[in-house]
Curated annotation (Swiss-Prot):
Induction: Transcribed at slowly increasing levels as cells progress from lag to exponential to stationary phase. BREX systems (bacteriophage exclusion) provide immunity against bacteriophage. A probably non-essential part of a type 1 BREX system which protects against dsDNA phage. This system allows phage adsorption but prevents phage DNA replication, without degradation of the phage DNA. Methylation of bacterial DNA by PglX guides self/non-self discrimination. Keywords: Antiviral defense. Coiled coil: none annotated. It holds the Pfam family BrxA. GO terms for biological process: defense response to virus. This is BREX protein BrxA. It comes from Escherichia coli O9:H4 (strain HS). It comes from the Bacteria. The gene is brxA. Disruption phenotype: No visible phenotype, host DNA is methylated on fifth position of 5'-GGTAAG-3' in chromosomal DNA, BREX still confers phage resistance. InterPro entries: BrxA (IPR014948), BrxA_sf (IPR023137). Disulfide bonds: none annotated.
């Protein structure tokens, strides 16, 4: 960490930066795993039960205990931005409901995703562009370093992984057709998704999620 940020004000800035990024490194939407975690959260498990289910029973079908714990921690952090009614939709609703709500959770836990959607994806659509350029994430990061200096503390590989996770999440939520082709697509929120945002006091996100802002 650079000396310029060693003051208490600097530490606050770095802390806020970390909150802006959230756990984007943790993965894209992880729909199947998130459904399983939502089901578990709805049982209000204590820590022992949580560990038994995640590690002992390997309910995420992960390749190792550490991978299971890492995925579970990331998903729980994201789902905790929602309410129990949203968890029920993620656990029992349609795939489209689940993906829209998981994208909302990702945005709430990693506000960098909201900014990328508003400033890059939606701007491209306003310009009637057809594709999300392959370098759009790196250009966005470069444009944000002064405002969010913690970005400079991440390795190139970590920045690239964040970008890959973000593009995969955009594809899962329908904003691009595939992570490889990146053809831009319109997204219309389901009534259930809009209701969750209203309940959470996040109705301002509706216009961003639908590309109107």
């Amino acid at each position: 960490m650079r000396a310029a940020f060693q003051s208490s004000e600097g530490f606050s800035m770095i802390k806020n930066d970390k909150a802006w990024i959230g756990d984007l490194l943790g993965g894209p939407l992880m729909s199947r795993e998130s459904r399983v975690i939502a089901e578990l959260l709805l049982t209000d498990p204590d820590e022992q039960t949580w560990q038994e289910q995640i590690v002992g029973h390997n309910i995420l079908q992960a390749s190792s205990p550490n991978t299971a714990k890492r995925y579970a921690a990331t998903i729980r952090l994201r789902l905790n931005t929602l309410d129990k009614s949203a968890w029920t939709l993620i656990a029992e609703g349609s795939e489209r409901e689940r993906q829209q709500l998981l994208f909302v959770a990702l945005m709430l836990h990693s506000p960098v995703v909201k900014d990328f959607l508003a400033e890059v994806v939606n701007d491209l659509r306003r310009q009637f562009k057809e594709k999300l350029p392959g370098n759009s994430w790196n250009e966005f990061v470069n444009s944000q370093v002064r405002l969010h200096p913690v970005l400079a503390s991440y390795s190139d590989s970590s920045i690239a992984k964040m970008g890959n996770n973000l593009v995969k999440a955009l594809a899962e939520a329908g904003y691009v057709d595939t992570p490889r082709r990146r053809n831009l697509q319109a997204v219309y929120l389901l009534p259930e998704t809009q209701a969750v945002l209203q309940r959470l006091g996040q109705q301002d996100l509706i216009s961003i999620l639908e590309g109107k802002r």
